[in-house]
Design a protein with these regions (language model features):
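C-terminal accessory extensions appended to soluble enzyme cores
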Residues: 83, 91-164
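Conserved AdoMet/S-adenosylmethionine-binding subsite of the radical SAM
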Residues: 1-118
Length: 164
């Protein structure tokens, strides 16, 4: 992001960063920037006066997920302390998968810890004629309520654009 820090954005440009719990980044996002690297970039752009947004995705239920996401928002708040967060946004996207994606993941990562058990999910028709597996309604509601509660606790002025 360094080459964008001195651009004349006139306060009209928003940087959106994908963030997740350390567990999800470490186990399911190989080859991506670390949690700390993402936060360092977010601090830089916020310091340059850009609006900030965070896409929490995919929100994944795993053992200890509540603690992991609490720590995510706690550390995010600590790292962004003193920054102008007056127009901070969050987008919340639960883990989902399609049958074709499941096949690819299982072929490329045969030892994955990613739970792709279709019997534990709800089938939802997608916009483009292909269905996807999402968490069941009660699990999705628990995810959404938990994320919104953490955001309200650590970023009371932030706007959650959506949960899907």
């Amino acid at each position: 992001v360094d080459h964008l820090l001195d651009a004349r954005h006139n306060g009209k440009t928003r940087f959106r960063f994908s963030i997740n719990s350390r567990y999800v980044i470490n186990h399911f996002e190989p080859g991506t920037s670390s949690f700390d690297g993402r936060l360092a970039a977010a601090r830089k752009v916020a310091g340059a006066g850009y609006k900030l947004g965070f896409v929490v995705a995919p929100i994944y239920r795993h053992e200890g997920w509540e603690r992991g996401y609490f720590e995510l928002f706690q550390e995010l708040a600590r790292q962004l302390e003193g920054m102008d967060l007056s127009d901070l946004t969050f987008e919340l996207i639960q883990h989902r998968f399609t049958k074709p994606a499941k096949r690819v993941i299982e072929q490329r990562y045969p030892k994955t810890r990613l739970d792709l058990d279709e019997t534990k999910r709800k089938y939802k028709w997608g916009r483009y004629g292909i269905g996807k597996y999402v968490y069941r309604d009660e699990e999705a509601k628990e995810l959404e309520d938990t994320m919104r509660r953490y955001i309200e606790q650590f970023f009371p002025g932030a706007y959650v654009q959506y949960f899907t």
